[in-house]
Swiss-Prot record:
It is found in: Cytoplasm. This is DNA replication and repair protein RecF. One of its GO terms (molecular function) is ATP hydrolysis activity. It comes from Pelotomaculum thermopropionicum (strain DSM 13744 / JCM 10971 / SI). The gene is recF. Its main location: cytoplasm.
């Protein structure tokens, strides 16, 4: 997928701005707080229907203005597609070729984003790593999103009953009905997670070897609160889940929360046998996340027949020279990339790069 033209009106610190990007590397250079990330945000919003920085439309509107709009002209699957997003406080309107659209403009992400905040996947809590499973790998299975939604709904209802059981000092009898549903959707969800990880890990490992020039080996394993093996089938997971719920029932009522299940699981990421969260340098952690982003790009290419757009916010220039060049050589001529930096401090000749200067809400 290619972005041919971007127009912003009253978006963040931009009054009125049009940008015609290049086909490959687009470098947005400028001092901090000039609007570089705002450009990436506008592209992400047009591709996905949401911002990666805020859920409040008001924050996307230029100060003292009543609305903002973004218009993007994309080339996708051999045709031109116009996406227009209009924002007023508390409301968002998305049009695709003049037709109102709810949710995702394209039906698939169309964009892969890497910001410094993504390092929390390595350094942060298990919830951050589950997000990778649920929202990055999950879309590659047709039933994953439905299963995740049903599990979360049942989990929320069950936790409410646990709170009620403690307050009323009951044994939580009605929980049995919800236990069955929790085990049904939870066992399916856990099975899908493990299956997707097993399916995709060889490609992830090979990519990581390539980006580190064979110097490092990555391992990713699934850590289940049910303590199951990776070869367990769905029925076996269900039985283990059901048994664990019975064992911890009293403790769950006391703590008013469900203590076992895929919502408590984690990924264990190691490099050369060492826990990446504890022992890897920030550069190594950044390379792990970059590996996962490149994997997503190539997997979406396999699924849809075209590459998504890549957005890199102040991360490319934090890589060492060898890893940066390995990445650019891999993506060059294939993926339309937008990257931000405070200054261009490496040789971009030969990478078909188009350089823009961003200053005070203007692009030149």
């Amino acid at each position: 997928m290619l972005l041919r033209r971007l127009e912003m009106l009253n978006f963040r610190n931009f009054a009125r701005q049009a940008v015609e990007p290049g086909l490959y590397f687009n470098v947005l250079s400028g001092r901090n707080a000039q609007g570089k990330t705002n450009i990436l945000e506008s592209i992400y919003l047009a591709c996905t229907g949401r911002s990666f920085r805020t859920a409040r439309e008001k924050e996307l509107i230029k100060r003292e203005k009543e609305f903002s709009s973004i218009r993007c002209l994309f080339e996708t699957r051999g045709r031109e597609v116009e996406v227009k997003v209009t924002l007023v406080p508390g409301r968002k309107r998305i049009e695709v070729n003049g037709v109102l659209k709810s949710g995702h403009p394209f039906g698939w992400p169309g964009v892969v984003l890497f910001t410094p905040d993504d390092l929390v996947m390595i350094k942060g809590s298990p919830a951050e790593r589950r997000r990778f499973l649920d929202y990055d790998l999950g879309p590659f299975h047709p039933h994953y999103a439905h299963c995740l939604d049903r599990y979360n709904r049942v989990l929320s209802q069950r936790n409410a009953l646990l709170r009620e059981a403690k307050e009323k000092r009951t044994t939580g009898g009605p929980l049995e009905v919800w236990d069955e549903q929790l085990c049904r959707y939870g066992s399916r969800l856990l099975f899908l997670r493990v299956s997707l990880l097993k399916k995709f890990f060889p490609a992830i490992r090979a990519l990581h070897r390539e980006l580190t020039e064979g110097a490092e080996n990555i391992e990713i394993s699934y850590l289940s609160s049910l303590k199951i093996g990776e070869e367990c089938g769905e029925d076996e997971i269900y039985e283990r889940f059901s048994g664990e719920l019975r064992l911890v029932r009293d403790e769950e009522i006391a703590r008013m929360q469900t203590l076992v299940g895929p919502h408590r699981d984690d990924l264990h990421i190691k490099v050369d046998g060492h826990d990446a969260r504890v022992y890897c340098s920030q550069g190594q952690q950044r390379t792990i996340v970059l590996t996962l982003k490149v994997f997503l790009i190539e997997q979406w290419r396999s699924e849809t027949g075209e590459y998504p757009i890549l957005l890199l916010d102040d991360v490319l220039f934090e890589l060492d020279d060898n890893r940066r060049e390995a990445l650019m050589c891999r993506l060059g001529g294939l993926v339309q990339t937008f990257l931000t930096c405070t200054r261009v401090n490496f040789d971009i000749e030969g990478f078909k790069a188009k350089v823009f200067t961003v200053s005070g809400g203007e692009v030149t």
